[in-house]
């Protein structure tokens, strides 16, 4: 059945434009509250958000929806997505909500839902919520005496700070490291610098002055130029860039070079394999991860299991096949020993542990393999299904035939934006550029003709 609201990472869109309106947010609260209203106990939801201007509006709407369904709402305020997942379990909530559009600009917002186990909801549960959204939910409203209460929870930052600190091995401190961190003017602007400082690092922070409209604006993991400049300016040993909700991370080494999620997963996998804590004899990544990562792991007797794009697919495969390391090239890294979803800060701490134990510079620690030339370009679309056009299908088939065993081709619609993503990789950079350019031209011509 076709999804009407939920994409690869919850419901997302431009604020105050359907579906990201307060009306729909309230209805999601009623629908989710109804579905998770099981048993006779007092039900509760935890609701977090990032620092977007629209977060206050959507937070209040969701509180109204959940309380109308008879669910008590525990309001957390601005806090990272992984903290919401952790607190959903810690506070014994029936459901968790994160109001965020992750790395998107402030105009966008979104709703992510977590079950009582801290994992994102299954497709089946999301479809049940969608079905209710289309119906009259008057019958599901609580009786007057059973309306839920709303409460702002204090001390949630401290709980997450302690959780994150516990993921660094007890024999490791960060003393002697100068760390520059970019919090993307987002949800981790308070907690991330505090964790690093409490573990002993000298911390230089940027992107920690959110004003509602500057989240991810020329900062954070999708725009690391400011961090590169800061690393050079203060001569930092490492730079850490989080995104708006802090579920992804990108590293900048002491030379200013960007280290992506593929390299970070390689570092963690190799380190955990050496101390025999890696499960599944490999890691889980998506079809977008570089072929160089796959070759690196194979050379060391480890496997790379690939999934569709989206950390929920990575997590699902990890759970089914008992892996404890997974993630995406974009910097979503899931370490199931420590959490149920991507956690940029916790992933960065594992890298810092390797840096401290080896005594080597970040540029040496984090350059684990030579990436195969890879090119990713996007085509913006306004509707339709250009990938189903016969001309586009033929161009894709021709490109796959040309690459054969010397590379890979991935073409897919974005699950969060109106884009077609075209990615190719292979040992011949010129060939890759030509193939991607040709496909972009064909898709664009079909889009313009529609």
Curated annotation (Swiss-Prot):
Residues modified as Phosphoserine: 102
> Catalytic residues per the record?
102
Asked if the record carries the keyword NAD, the reply is no
Q: CDD domains in the record, alphabetically?
A: GlmM
Q: Which residues form a coiled coil?
A: none
Reactions listed under catalytic activity: alpha-D-glucosamine 1-phosphate = D-glucosamine 6-phosphate
Q: Does the keyword Phosphoprotein apply?
A: yes
Pfam families documented for this protein: PGM_PMM_I, PGM_PMM_II, PGM_PMM_III, PGM_PMM_IV
What's the domain of life for this entry?
A: Bacteria
The record's annotation in Gene3D superfamilies points to:
Alpha-D-Glucose-1,6-Bisphosphate, subunit A, domain 3, Alpha-D-phosphohexomutase, C-terminal domain
Keywords attached to this Swiss-Prot or TrEMBL record, sorted alphabetically, are: Isomerase, Magnesium, Metal-binding, Phosphoprotein
Q: What is its EC number?
A: 5.4.2.10
State a GO cellular component annotated for this protein. Answer: cytosol
Could you say which cofactors this protein requires?
A: Mg(2+)
InterPro entries, alphabetized = A-D-PHexomutase_a/b/a-I, A-D-PHexomutase_a/b/a-I/II/III, A-D-PHexomutase_a/b/a-II, A-D-PHexomutase_a/b/a-III, A-D-PHexomutase_C, A-D-PHexomutase_C_sf, A-D-PHexomutase_CS, Alpha-D-phosphohexomutase_SF
Where Mg(2+) binds, per the record, is at 102, 243, 245, 247
Q: How is the cofactor bound?
A: Binds 1 Mg(2+) ion per subunit.
PTM notes? Activated by phosphorylation.
Q: Which GO terms describe its molecular function?
A: magnesium ion binding; phosphoglucosamine mutase activity; phosphomannomutase activity
GO terms for biological process, alphabetical: carbohydrate metabolic process; peptidoglycan biosynthetic process; UDP-N-acetylglucosamine biosynthetic process
What the record says about family reads: Belongs to the phosphohexose mutase family.
Q: Under what name is this protein listed?
A: Phosphoglucosamine mutase
Organism encoding this protein: Rhizobium rhizogenes (strain K84 / ATCC BAA-868)
